[in-house]
Amino acid sequence: MRFLPCIATLAATASALAIGDHIRSDDQYVLELGPGETKVVTEAEKWALRAEGKRFFDITGRTSSLELASNKKQKLAVTYPDSVQHNETVQNLINSLDKKNFETVLQPFSEFHNRYYKSDNGKKSSEWLQGKIQEIISASGAKGVTVEPFKHFFPQSSLIAKIPGKSDKTIVLGAHQDSINLNSPSEGRAPSADDDGSGVVTILEAFRVLLTDEKVAAGEAPNTVEFHFYAGEEGGLLGSQDIFEQYLQKSRDVKAMLQQDMTGYTKGTTDAGKPESIGIITDNVDENLTKFLKIIVDAYCTIPTVDSKCGYGCSDHASATKYGYPAAFAFESAFGDDSPYIHSADDTIETVNFDHVLQHGRLTLGFAYELAFADSL
């Protein structure tokens, strides 16, 4: 591991901490900007890096978990189907996706002044979202389905909605619920309709429709499916790191994780004269799972894919990868054609193309159903 100035003392202290003992400092944070590239910063410096477009893990107090994650990764070997197996069922479910539901949820979700993870707004928005998830569960009558908050050292909780299957083999669908205005992180207006309100409503609607399937609702799928709504992504993948660190500690058998972060902006693509596409991220992901994701898009979406890279620590799939779990990431476009309004007051619902969100809903539903019923994982 390569250390930048002033890191050695703090890293030595961090390595002595027990896994999960995330001692925080108001003054200094340890950021991982790339494999083996770490830097100690103040909070102001942390946000300055984000404003420069730098992405990172905040690994303050987490150093001792990295070796365990590496060991876990070496043991994982998952074989995914080479074609879709449930086309008729999934196509019927896709017909139940309701584009109006995206806007119905996203409008009030983006009306919170912000969803900053350290703020009361972040806490309240998480509680509001949990209520919406519970409404879906209650209306479905599904057996044993739950939504639970996952607590962190900051006020906002992540949320985990679980659909039990016949085994503990688990498929995870993720999006992040927090928001930030990088000009004023704690106080600034940050509707974040696209980043990542669009991802939240994408997987929420897929969750609703998945529960209309009788076998899924009865717990008869071979594998368990979880929908994760991560807190603190903008602060350095904080919520997802906590979750996947705990899953590693508990030897949770996660067979696949798909992240949906920004699913609604298409103007950058079309203005560039390019076809509307699903961006498939190819760095810091599992190659085999990414190939399977492309199979899903080809089968269940009506637009093509485009390969792209997003850099180190760019969204919560990177936390799954870090802790040894196979992950993939579907994005609204190729990087560079994505929304220019993120992290500002201008990331509003008016910038979101709900037809494109629907395409992401189709792939989410197909991904979840095909892997929920995959016996060979």
Swiss-Prot record:
Main location: secreted
Signal peptide: 1-16
Stretches of the chain forming a coiled coil according to its record: none
InterPro entries documented for this protein: M28_fam, Peptidase_M28
A cellular component annotation (GO) from this entry: extracellular region
Keywords of the record: Aminopeptidase, Disulfide bond, Glycoprotein, Hydrolase, Metal-binding, Protease, Secreted, Signal, Zinc, Zymogen
EC top class named in words: hydrolase
Disulphide linkage map: 310-314
Residues involved in Zn(2+) 2 binding: 195, 234, 343
Cofactor, free-text remark: Binds 2 Zn(2+) ions per subunit.
Description of pH dependence: Optimum pH is 7.1-10.
Localisation per UniProt entry: Secreted
Molecular functions per Gene Ontology: aminopeptidase activity; metal ion binding; metalloexopeptidase activity
Residue span(s) of the pro-peptide: 17-77
CDD domains in the record: M28_AAP
EC number(s) stated in the UniProt entry for this protein: 3.4.11.-
Sites where a glycan is attached: 87, 288
Cross-referenced Pfam families: Peptidase_M28
GO BP, one annotated term: proteolysis
Cofactors, names only: Zn(2+)
Similarity-based family: Belongs to the peptidase M28 family. M28E subfamily.
Main function: Extracellular aminopeptidase that allows assimilation of proteinaceous substrates.
PANTHER family registered for this protein in UniProt: AMINOPEPTIDASE YDR415C-RELATED, METALLOPEPTIDASE M28 FAMILY MEMBER
Subunit structure: Monomer.
UniProt-recorded name of the protein: Leucine aminopeptidase 1
